[in-house]
Each structure stands twice: as C-alpha cells, then as structure tokens.
Amino acid sequence: MAVVKVKPTSPGRRGVVKIVHKHLHKGKPEASLLEPQMQNAGRNNNGHITVRHKGGGHKHHYRVVDFRRNKDGIPAKVERIEYDPNRTAHIALICYADGERSYIIAPRGLEAGQTVLNGAEAPIKAGNTLPIRNIPVGSTIHCVEMMPGKGAQIARSAGTSVTLMAREGIYAQVRLRSGEVRKIHIDCRATIGEVSNEEHNLRQYGKAGAKRWLGIRPTVRGVAMNPVDHPHGGGEGRTGEGQAPVSPWNTLTKGYRTRNNKRTQTFIVSRRKK
C-alpha cells in the first residue's frame, strides 16, 4: 500500500489523498458469490427515512462473505485479494481443498498463495479461525463472534482488532479498540491477526462528489434549518443553538449515553473510554 497525494490541478483535486493498493485483483469478482443489492436510500418499507444522509451512489453487488468459518479441518488456498465496495476492509477469495470457494475478511499481511485453516486444531497464524478457548492469551484477533455459531460481529472493519486479555471459566475477556473490556463465551470463534487496509483512515476525498459516489448525501446543520425541522432552527440572522445540543428528535447529543440494552449489560466488564 502507498499513500499518494494528488497534484492540485483543480479545486476538486486539491487536498486529495489516495491509498494505492497494487496487490488487489483487477478483474471481476467471483460470480457465484454475488447477490443483487437493492438501494433503499435510507428508507424503510413505508418509505420513511430511517437513516438520514443516504441516497444515490454507484450500483454494486453484495459480496457474500463467510463470517462463520465453520468448515473445519479442510485447508483453503488464498486465490486473490479483492476490493469490496460494501465495507472498508478488503476481502480474500479462498478455495477449499474440496473445491468450494468463499470470501473471507482479509487480515493484514495475507497474500495470494497462502493457506488458511478453520477449527480447533488450526495453527496460530494470521487468517486462521479457532475457538477462543484454543487461542493464547494476549493474541491479537478480529472477526470475533458474540454468540457461538452466530458469525463474526466484532472487529470487522479496516484496521481493527481486539486483544484477548484473559480466560475465566466459560468466558474470556477481550479488550476492544474503544477501550471496552467485554466477556465472550470461549466457544465463540475468532480469526488471528488484524483486519487489512489499515491505512483506510488516511484517505482524503477532496470534494463532495466523491462522497456522493459512495451514496452519502450532505449533512445540514440544525441551526441552518427552520424551527419546524429542527430544535436548533429559527432565529433572526445567525444564531446559536440556544440550548443544550440535541438531535432532530430532541434527544441530548454530544456525550449523552443512549444505550438501553440491559440484557447484555452483565457482559461488559469495563465501559469504553470517551
């Protein structure tokens, strides 16, 4: 990977920083692992906006990624590393010894031609997936399950990872990048290593149109709206918020905690750092 600063030949290119990935596959993705993806522009089945600032963007297919990694004992060869428009991380196309192909989240350092393995007997090597009970304490892992057999949910985006801190009984403690320490069942699976594309956060888009290609629409400030549209709206001329910052639905924002999942509260050993 290389970080390239583009020459300022136009206002839209001034300040653009690109991440060049010469190792990525330049052809088409595996057709058998593609699914159509309908664009909903942030609307639900009633047509109501459920996620703001979404719409447009380039059309693309969904790549079916294997987050369970439950095909044990069969070695798989990495055929290539690909770009995935649906996520920040890169994906790897692997082919098992029995001929089955699948996509996995590519860990940092994984290259075409290498071999990955799933199961309790897999060696501790980047890209291999094991139950947490078989992973040494102190290891850096990613694609961690929260429930056995449910599939990876933690540390799936570019450059992320968690650290296995300890094991006590049927639970292990992992420390997330946010600083949160969480209990996870030792039968949950995790993949060794760190997620690829760790320089993703260094990219600078340079112009609004580059974000529109991704399906991201403009974000309008509340103080620039009318009172009917936002609690911060209204006033003569330029005015401030006039109150504690709130969301469009009058919920306190900028630091106010909204987590209300009491069912899994016991699995959090230490809350994340602010």
Swiss-Prot record:
Domain of life assignment: Bacteria
The keyword Transcription appears for this protein: no
Gene Ontology annotations for the cellular component aspect, listed alphabetically: large ribosomal subunit
Biased composition (Basic and acidic residues): 229-239
Keyword set includes RNA-binding: yes
Pfam families, per database record: Ribosomal_L2, Ribosomal_L2_C
Signal sequence annotation: none
Region (Disordered): 224-254
Matches recorded under InterPro entries: NA-bd_OB-fold (IPR012340), Rib_uL2_dom2 (IPR014722), Ribosomal_uL2 (IPR002171), Ribosomal_uL2_bac/org-type (IPR005880), Ribosomal_uL2_C (IPR022669), Ribosomal_uL2_CS (IPR022671), Ribosomal_uL2_dom3 (IPR014726), Ribosomal_uL2_RNA-bd_dom (IPR022666)
Keywords: Ribonucleoprotein, Ribosomal protein, RNA-binding, rRNA-binding
Gene Ontology terms: biological process: cytoplasmic translation
A GO MF label: rRNA binding
HAMAP family assigned to the protein according to its UniProt record, in alphabetical order: Ribosomal_uL2_B (MF_01320_B)
Function, as annotated: One of the primary rRNA binding proteins. Required for association of the 30S and 50S subunits to form the 70S ribosome, for tRNA binding and peptide bond formation. It has been suggested to have peptidyltransferase activity; this is somewhat controversial. Makes several contacts with the 16S rRNA in the 70S ribosome.
Protein family membership: Belongs to the universal ribosomal protein uL2 family.
NCBIfam families the UniProt entry points to: rplB_bact
Assembly and interaction partners: Part of the 50S ribosomal subunit. Forms a bridge to the 30S subunit in the 70S ribosome.
Protein name: Large ribosomal subunit protein uL2
Name of the gene: rplB
